Amino acid sequence: APVTPGVAVDLSHIPTDVKIKGFSGEDATPALEGADVVLISAGVARKPGMDRSDLFNVNAGIVKNLVQQIAKTCPQACVGIITNPVNTTVAIAAEVLKKAGVYDKNKLFGVTTLDIIRSNTFVAELKGKSSSDVEVPVIGGHSGVTILPLLSQIPGVSFSEQEVADLTKRIQNAGTEVVEAKAGGGSATLSMGQAAARFGLSLVRAMQGEKGVVECAYVEGDG
């Protein structure tokens, strides 16, 4: 598997205004110093026959360790959790930040953007539209049946009851579709990378003062 510094060198050859640095090792402090946004995608991937909850025992410890380092090094950063099972790893991150006395519910996000881009793709395919013209809000986090696409909220598009049932099931099971298609070779990586980039860039645009930037995410409510 490619190591992080090698991936960083590869990325650094792409002509953008972003400066790329790569870090590796157990101590994430050098990578976290001065960070305004941290996205955590570290963890083991699903294999056929597993669901996201099967990853908990390993991934919970990984997230806990990284968030403890965030609490020490960049406690004011906005933190996006991509590591599955998102609904649980976000809760772990929240407890670690609370214990450190630096928790801000407005700065901790479960990144569920992958469900949104999948929904946009599947709806566009079904209705013969361009995916760039479709935006499906998805709520409930990123754990199987909790994934709830709000299909009734898409302007100018209507669905039969059967279409709603079929689409919802496909969106909820899209991750399994990829895992099975890869036949033991991992889970969704390319589409997840696109989703993570979209969420991260939206966060940065909003932090820079751009108005009207909206993304769905798994967050603590006001209740």
From Swiss-Prot:
Residue pairs linked by disulfide bridges in the UniProt entry: none
Protein keywords: NAD, Oxidoreductase, Tricarboxylic acid cycle
Residues annotated as binding NAD(+) are 59, 82-84, 192
What GO molecular function terms would the record report? L-malate dehydrogenase (NAD+) activity
The EC designation for this entry is 1.1.1.37
Quote the catalytic activity from the record.
Answer: (S)-malate + NAD(+) = oxaloacetate + NADH + H(+)
Residues the record marks as active site: 142 (proton acceptor)
Q: Which GO terms describe its biological process?
A: malate metabolic process; tricarboxylic acid cycle
Record-annotated residues binding substrate? 46, 52, 84, 118
The UniProt subunit note reads as follows: Homodimer.
- Give the family from UniProt: Belongs to the LDH/MDH superfamily. MDH type 1 family.
What this protein is reported to do is described as: Catalyzes the reversible oxidation of malate to oxaloacetate.
Q: Which PANTHER family match?
A: MALATE AND LACTATE DEHYDROGENASE (PTHR11540), MALATE DEHYDROGENASE, MITOCHONDRIAL (PTHR11540:SF16)
Designated name of the protein: Malate dehydrogenase
